[in-house]
Amino acid sequence: MRIILLGAPGAGKGTQAQNIMKKFGIPQISTGDMLRAAVKAGSPLGLKVKEVMATGGLVSDETIIALVKDRIKEDDCANGFLFDGFPRTIPQAEALREAGVKIDHVVEIAVDDQEIIKRLSGRRVHEASGRVYHVDYNPPKVEGKDDVTGEPLVQREDDKEETVRKRLEVYHSQTAPLVDYYRSWAEKDADAAPEYLRVEGVGSVDEIRDRVFTGLQK
């Protein structure tokens, strides 16, 4: 089972990725982890990556595809893999296709922007313990205070509405076009293209998990 998982920040991809990995016995592959591992290993490719990252540059798609091809040859990918955060752009998706990397399913966890803004901007955190609350879905007993210590809760910078809106803008301009790319490829050439699966990302974690599994096991 070779899967690409797509969805906006706050759509619940992380939770569903864990469910998919457990169910199908496949590793989650993120480009960040691959880049760090290559640098640590000190391979020729890793040294190249280190050089680019040291100057604050962007690692080329060609280098990332080379890393992907090496990574999926490893033993833990015998049953497949789950790509998280890759591909991010249509050129990366095309490079993956041209490199002959076979993908079985592209899963999109679909949640509308207003719901994501509500989910993320409503989060409150107790910094010392890491306890997370939500003003609507999981409120503290006393507004703005941690249940255990009574200390004040904070809203992380990443969860502020303005920041969430900016992150969504980036997603819509860069990654959302991938949905159209894979959908249209599946319509034109169903035999060669990955199966495109759109899963409604609103509901309980278990409901969404069941939708994902049902779609993948059709």
From Swiss-Prot:
Gene3D superfamilies: P-loop containing nucleotide triphosphate hydrolases (3.40.50.300). It is found in: Cytoplasm. Its EC number is 2.7.4.3. Keywords: ATP-binding, Cytoplasm, Kinase, Nucleotide biosynthesis, Nucleotide-binding, Transferase. AMP binds at T31, R36, G57, L58, V59, G85, F86, P87, R88, Q92, R156, R167. One of its GO terms (molecular function) is ATP binding. It comes from the Bacteria. CDD domains: ADK. One of its GO terms (biological process) is AMP salvage. Belongs to the adenylate kinase family. Consists of three domains, a large central CORE domain and two small peripheral domains, NMPbind and LID, which undergo movements during catalysis. The LID domain closes over the site of phosphoryl transfer upon ATP binding. Assembling and dissambling the active center during each catalytic cycle provides an effective means to prevent ATP hydrolysis. NCBIfam families: adk (TIGR01351), PRK00279.1-1 (NF001379), PRK00279.1-2 (NF001380), PRK00279.1-3 (NF001381), PRK14527.1 (NF011100). HAMAP family: Adenylate_kinase_Adk (MF_00235). This is Adenylate kinase. The gene is adk.
